[in-house]
Amino acid sequence: MEAPRSDQAHTDATTPMEAIRTTSLGTNNYGPVPDDYLDLPVREVNDGADLREYITETRTGEIIKPIKSNVTGKTEDWKMVTFTIDDPENPKNWSKAFKWYCTMVVAFTCFVVAFCSSVITADVEGPIEEFGIGREASLVVITVFVIGFGLGPMVFAPMSEIVGRRPVYALTLALAVIFVIPCAVSKNIGTLIVCRLIDGIAFSAPMTLVGGTLADLWKSEERGVPMAAFSAAPFIGPAIGPLVGGYLADNCGWRWLYWIQLILAFVAWVMITFTVPETFAPILLKKRAQKLRKAEDDPKYTTETELDARPMGEKLRIFLFRPFQLLFLEPIVLFISLYMSVIYGLLYMFFVAYPIVYMGGKGWSASNTGLMFIPLAIGVIFSACCAPFVNNHYLKVSVAYGGKPPAEKRLIPMMWACWCIPSGLFVFAWTSYPDLHWMGPAMGGFLIGVGVILLYNSANNYLVDTYQHQAASALAAKTFIRSIWGACTVLFTEQMYERLGDQWASTLLAFIGLACCAIPYVFYFKGESIRRFSKFAFSDDEEKAIKA
């Protein structure tokens, strides 16, 4: 059948227009706001699909849609299944307490994943001594895990749109739990490397899906605080990992760095598998349509994803290749991704730099060195607490632009937070002499913690607002290049500090961070012009088509 035009859809005659309301909008124009594209099956349907089905509630639970049959040539009315008004099965209508519980479970899961990525940095020497390997081989164990972070989303993001979020959470976390065990009992470095790669791929799923899960649960005007809670988790985890790992390494040995991962990952798997229901609206409505077809003996009950007749190969091409198209053809995606890669790489460099400064320079133990990550974590928490205020400021800007602010307004937090990174690095660099007080480098970490969350959130929001219907692919591109670079930095950080010295190595990073400060300013002033010539950026013409 032909792809229906969005202006062909109309409501059931028994359902007056005023009986329809959007579940994630405060208006009656039936068009999704940018954040909603994380909650819509954009890559699962063709460009002519009508997305109202997923963002409206109707009195009868259906929207009548006329579609011309490719077989008979006649126009037939199909019943597009929707949620009913105040539908208890709509995740956005769940009680606020339960939505917060689900939010904290997925945020805790992200914390565990981030914790697992960094906890082993507390004792790189353990496997070296036991297996008789070089230091670079031991660092590869960290690297392959982060590489997995970049590879996994290419598979798990499309999988979640096809089968739902809950099965992907359950399957991948179970896989991650299983492959932590061989790490803890490994007899050689090969086992560690292979199993850590598998764990990295498996653990990437929660990081990939949580943004969509929160979009499933919360209306756009409610997402500010939940998103702040989530955004802090992936950065607090890496800060807490070396702290806990240091004490375990000093008192229990390096294998306990994996046993603690097993314990936390198992708890996260149990909580998210058995207490958090499916939240993805297209899957929920698809199951409802299947039940209605059977109960009513009427094949006309359907959903947009079921109407899409494109072969799976074409969908996979979009899933797998579109992120790279955006990365190499879109300057906005490329430079924002490079900037976030610098920030992410810096975070993993710190896992190596802190032991160099505190253990090598000051002669501290691993456990005491881990304490120096606390200011970094405090900076992250402080920044996350600022997120609601940043969101309120953006809402005021949005009102000033009649509800349609340019995407570049998302860069305002980045334009001042970007200076925190080089400032923190300069402080870290020139207070890292062995005879100076330990507080200096720690305060540098605090400044970096403050900047990193605001940069991360601002970058994500800018990409989502700029590409909207391509948002998932843009974020996947950013995640891929960010993870690959973060993995590489671990391998050369020690050599860089050895050859340049502690102060000048950190200063080099500070100058790189300083150069990156130009990126948000360039896009703030020139981004609109760049978007005008973009093949993929969202345009007003597309918005009018959606709202028609």
From Swiss-Prot:
It is a multi-pass membrane protein. It holds the Pfam family MFS_1. Belongs to the major facilitator superfamily. DHA1 family. Polyamines/proton antiporter (TC 2.A.1.2.16) subfamily. Keywords: Glycoprotein, Membrane, Peroxisome, Transmembrane, Transmembrane helix, Transport. Residues 1-32 are annotated as: Disordered. Glycans are attached at N70, N93. Disruption phenotype: Leads to a clear reduction in benzylpenicillin production. A motif (Peroxisomal targeting signal) lies at residues 258-269. The peroxisomal targeting signal allows recruitment to the peroxisomal membrane by pex19. This is MFS-rype transporter paaT. It is found in: Peroxisome membrane. Its main location: membrane. InterPro entries: MFS (IPR011701), MFS_dom (IPR020846), MFS_trans_sf (IPR036259). The gene is paaT. GO terms for molecular function: transmembrane transporter activity. MFS-type transporter involved in penicillin production, most likely through the translocation of side-chain precursors (phenylacetic acid and phenoxyacetic acid) from the cytosol to the peroxisomal lumen across the peroxisomal membrane. Residues 21-30 have a biased composition (Polar residues). The chain crosses the membrane at residues 100-120, 139-159, 174-194, 197-217, 224-244, 256-276, 332-352, 370-390, 411-431, 436-456, 471-493, 505-525. It comes from the Eukaryota. One of its GO terms (cellular component) is plasma membrane. Residues 1-10 have a biased composition (Basic and acidic residues).
